[in-house]
Amino acid sequence: MTVIADVISDASQRMSKTLEAAKEDFGTVSAGRANPALFQKVLVDYYGSPTPLAQLAGLQNPEARVLIVTPYDKGALKEIERAIVTMPSMSANVGNDGEIVRVTLPELTEDRRKEFVKIVRGKGEDAKVAIRNIRRRAKDELDALKGEVGDDEVARGEKELEALTRTNVDLVDEALKRKEAELLEV
């Protein structure tokens, strides 16, 4: 494998990771339906250390707007409830019956849906900027190789890098459009 192929391969892997991170980020924005992905980044203060909710409890959604959080350790119930209640952008009704935490999401108003669309667009733009930064770093690496390998090879590598960047930016746009449609669906 040539040095140019290594640079392109590394950029491709980093862009793929950025795309996956963007999709996960989109999943954390509520569309009015209970989805375990909404609670992916919730950290619970479990005996003094921040612990991901998924490690402390099972998550099920028996109804479209209801999520049941079943702690593995009943002693963590209060802390789990507190972590969910203090989540930013979560205007859910949270109830604790001593065994489980029931999270009921309210119907989203049109204004709230539009607000969430703006948030998702911001996350999409951040992902595109990250992909372009990866392209810029890879291009700098290719430019540094101009003395070692032929200019034609570097130009081919840059062309391949541009196509890779365009593809990944388009994939972010597709995921963004799907999430926007999901958010605006009543």
UniProtKB/Swiss-Prot annotation:
Keywords, sorted A to Z: Cytoplasm, Protein biosynthesis
Principal location: cytoplasm
Gene3D superfamilies (UniProt xref): 3.30.1360.40, Ribosome-recycling factor
Pfam families: RRF (PF01765)
Protein origin, superkingdom: Bacteria
HAMAP family reported for this sequence: RRF
Protein name in UniProt: Ribosome-recycling factor
Lineage of producing organism: Bacteria, Bacillati, Actinomycetota, Actinomycetes, Micrococcales
